[in-house]
Curated annotation (Swiss-Prot):
An example Gene Ontology CC term for this record: cytoplasm
Subcellular location: Cytoplasm
Location, primary (coarse class): cytoplasm
Domain of life: Bacteria
Keywords of this entry: Cytoplasm, Methyltransferase, rRNA processing, S-adenosyl-L-methionine, Transferase
Protein species of origin: Delftia acidovorans (strain DSM 14801 / SPH-1)
Protein name per UniProt: Ribosomal RNA large subunit methyltransferase H
UniProt-listed SUPFAM superfamilies: alpha/beta knot
Family: Belongs to the RNA methyltransferase RlmH family.
Lineage per the UniProt record: Bacteria, Pseudomonadati, Pseudomonadota, Betaproteobacteria, Burkholderiales
Length: 155
């Protein structure tokens, strides 16, 4: 199984990339994690709809066919660590590759959000995009550790 994190925005601070890389290398070989950063559409005088369309096209191009799409959305389902671990286990049992989508500064195209297989949220807080990448991969690693009985997660 592969977890694909698709994030709108190509540039993150070094600290965020270092933290992301640290968690990414902890995953076992049977659960590969890949990050695909797609370009943020330059704002200029474009409408939000134009921005959404351009970014959606890039996101869709980054996702292989047949991949389960899970978007991070402030209106998505709020999950506990245990619930995320159960979701991860379900995806693994189904053999699905999963793409977790982090939108750009203006969010995601509403139709794309609605078409996703699932919508989840990481927090009630507004977080910087670089922090979301780190928080997401850490929580995915934590979910894996719960399922694997690894001592990383403690009750």
């Amino acid at each position: 199984m592969k977890l694909l994190i698709v994030a709108v925005g190509q540039h993150v601070p070094d600290w965020a990339q270092t933290a992301y890389d640290d968690y990414a290398k902890r995953f076992p070989p049977e659960l590969k994690v890949e990050l695909k950063a797609v370009k943020t559409e330059p704002r200029g005088s474009k409408t939000v709809e134009t921005l959404y369309a351009a970014e959606r096209k890039r996101i869709e191009a980054a996702i292989p066919r047949g991949t389960r799409i899970v978007v991070l959305d402030e209106r998505g389902t709020n999950l506990t660590t245990k619930a995320l671990a159960q979701r991860l286990q379900g995806w693994q049992l189904e053999g699905d590759d999963v793409a977790l989508i982090i939108g750009g500064p203006d969010g995601l195209d509403p139709a794309f959000r609605q078409a996703a297989h699932e919508r989840i949220r990481l927090s009630d807080l507004t977080l910087p995009h670089a922090m979301v990448r780190v928080l997401l991969i850490e929580q995915l690693y934590r979910a894996w550790s719960v399922n694997a009985g690894h001592p990383y997660h403690r009750e």
